Amino acid sequence: MLSSLANPRQAASQLLNFALILSTAFMMWKGLSVVSDSPSPIVVVLSGSMEPAFQRGDLLFLWNRNIIQETEVGEIVVYEVRGKNIPIVHRVVRKFGAGSEAKLLTKGDNNQGSDEELYAKDQDFLVRKDIIGSVVAYIPFVGYVTILLSEYPWLKTAMLGIMGLVVVLQRE
C-alpha cells in the first residue's frame, strides 16, 4: 500500500488528480453562479422555519431573476442580512412598490411573525439587492451532510483525512 509513496511520479499524479477534482468542482460552482446570476446558487435549509414546505437539510437551487421578472408575494426567496453571512430561506408576504425600489417583507411559513427582527439594524424591509435568489428546485435531505459537518467539526477533519488517505493510497 505504501509502495505508491516511494514512487514520486505516482504520488505527483495522484496529487494532480486530487487538484483536478477540486478545481473542477470550483469551476462548476462558479459556472452555476454565472448562469443563475446568484452568488450562492445552492443553499441548505438550516432551520425548521419553512416547514412544511422545506425541511431542515433540504438542498435548494436558486435563480436570481431580477433582470427578467420582479419578486412577487408568495415567492420563496433566500436573502442575506446585511453584515451577516447566513442565508435565510423565507416567503415574501408583502410587497410595497415595484421595480428595483420595491420593499419586501418576508416570513417563515412555520414562524408566528414576520422577519423584521431578523433584518439589519435600522432596516424594516428587504430590497431587491438583499435577495440572493428565488427557490426553483430542491432535493430533500441531501444537505444534511453540510449540517453534520458544521455541527460536528471533528467529522470534517475525519472526512478530509480519509479522503486524503484514499488519494495517496489509491492504485491505478
From Swiss-Prot:
<protein>
    <recommendedName>
        <fullName>Signal peptidase complex catalytic subunit SEC11</fullName>
        <ecNumber>3.4.21.89</ecNumber>
    </recommendedName>
</protein>
<keyword id="KW-0378">Hydrolase</keyword>
<feature type="active site" description="Charge relay system">
    <location>
        <position position="49"/>
    </location>
</feature>
<keyword id="KW-0472">Membrane</keyword>
<comment type="function">
    <text>Catalytic component of the signal peptidase complex (SPC) which catalyzes the cleavage of N-terminal signal sequences from nascent proteins as they are translocated into the lumen of the endoplasmic reticulum. Specifically cleaves N-terminal signal peptides that contain a hydrophobic alpha-helix (h-region) shorter than 18-20 amino acids.</text>
</comment>
<feature type="topological domain" description="Lumenal">
    <location>
        <begin position="36"/>
        <end position="172"/>
    </location>
</feature>
<keyword id="KW-1133">Transmembrane helix</keyword>
<dbReference type="GO" id="GO:0045047">
    <property type="term" value="P:protein targeting to ER"/>
</dbReference>
<keyword id="KW-0735">Signal-anchor</keyword>
<keyword id="KW-0256">Endoplasmic reticulum</keyword>
<dbReference type="InterPro" id="IPR036286">
    <property type="entry name" value="LexA/Signal_pep-like_sf"/>
</dbReference>
<feature type="transmembrane region" description="Helical; Signal-anchor for type II membrane protein">
    <location>
        <begin position="15"/>
        <end position="35"/>
    </location>
</feature>
<dbReference type="GO" id="GO:0006465">
    <property type="term" value="P:signal peptide processing"/>
</dbReference>
<keyword id="KW-0645">Protease</keyword>
<feature type="active site" description="Charge relay system">
    <location>
        <position position="115"/>
    </location>
</feature>
<dbReference type="InterPro" id="IPR019756">
    <property type="entry name" value="Pept_S26A_signal_pept_1_Ser-AS"/>
</dbReference>
<feature type="active site" description="Charge relay system">
    <location>
        <position position="90"/>
    </location>
</feature>
<keyword id="KW-0812">Transmembrane</keyword>
<dbReference type="GO" id="GO:0005787">
    <property type="term" value="C:signal peptidase complex"/>
</dbReference>
<comment type="similarity">
    <text>Belongs to the peptidase S26B family.</text>
</comment>
<feature type="region of interest" description="C-terminal short (CTS) helix">
    <location>
        <begin position="158"/>
        <end position="169"/>
    </location>
</feature>
<comment type="subunit">
    <text>Component of the signal peptidase complex (SPC) composed of a catalytic subunit SEC11 and three accessory subunits SPC1, SPC2 and SPC3. The complex induces a local thinning of the ER membrane which is used to measure the length of the signal peptide (SP) h-region of protein substrates. This ensures the selectivity of the complex towards h-regions shorter than 18-20 amino acids. SPC associates with the translocon complex.</text>
</comment>
<dbReference type="InterPro" id="IPR001733">
    <property type="entry name" value="Peptidase_S26B"/>
</dbReference>
<dbReference type="GO" id="GO:0004252">
    <property type="term" value="F:serine-type endopeptidase activity"/>
</dbReference>
<feature type="topological domain" description="Cytoplasmic">
    <location>
        <begin position="1"/>
        <end position="14"/>
    </location>
</feature>
